[in-house]
Structures are given as C-alpha cells and as structure tokens.
Design a protein with these regions (language model features):
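A short Gly-Trp-Pro
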Residues: 2-115
C-alpha cells in the first residue's frame, strides 16, 4: 500500500493509535510487511502507551540498527535485516529484562497468529 511504501522505503512514521497491530494481543509472530521476515514474537510485546506496537526484544538476527539524526534528534532507527525496510526506532526506556522499547510502525508489519 502507499502507507507501507512510505514507512518501509521512505522511513516515514504512521500516526500513533492508527494501527490495528497496536491492539493485537494474540500469540503469534510479527513479520516485515515488505518481505515477511519474522521480526518479533508476541511474547515480547507490551503496551508502551505510545500508540505504536512496542516490543522489548526482536527475534535473533531479525533487525538491524542505524543512527537517525533527522528532525534535530539523535535516535536509533530499526530496519528489517532481510530487505532493509524501515520499521521504527529503539529507545532505552523499555521494561525488563532488556530495558529496551522497540517502537514499531504497525503498517510496516504483518501478524500471523500461532497455530
């Protein structure tokens, strides 16, 4: 979709509280909407109160990180390790055990319920 292209390929950001995946609470896996690379397990998802799907840990080797200095801020951008699609940002204000908050754009992901 145009919204997926904007986020995944142009590093856009969806408006908070607009993704159905923010309210997804079933067991399953969140994958890249661009290539279906498995990114996050639902067991690491938590409600961060930000309006974006948030996780405290990605699956092994699923994502990469780069420095993002856009908009006068220095942040760590998160991208799909397979296709390079922009997913969101990671912050150090998350819960235990990692203390990290992977703040993801829901439009950049798909969800597959556990069978």
């Amino acid at each position: 979709t145009p919204a997926q292209f904007d986020v995944l390929r142009r590093e856009g950001t969806e408006r908070p509280y607009t993704s159905p995946l923010n309210d997804e609470h079933r067991n399953g896996t969140f994958s890249c909407a661009g290539c279906e690379q498995r990114l996050f397990s639902s067991s690491t998802k938590f409600d961060s109160g930000t309006g974006w799907p948030s996780f405290w840990q990605p699956l092994a080797a699923a994502v990469g990180e780069t420095r993002d200095s856009s908009f006068g801020m220095v942040r760590t951008a998160v991208h799909c390790a397979n296709c390079g699609g922009h997913l969101g940002h990671v912050f150090d204000d998350g819960p235990r055990p990692t203390g990290l908050r992977y703040c993801m754009n829901g439009v950049a992901m798909s969800f597959t319920p556990q069978a």
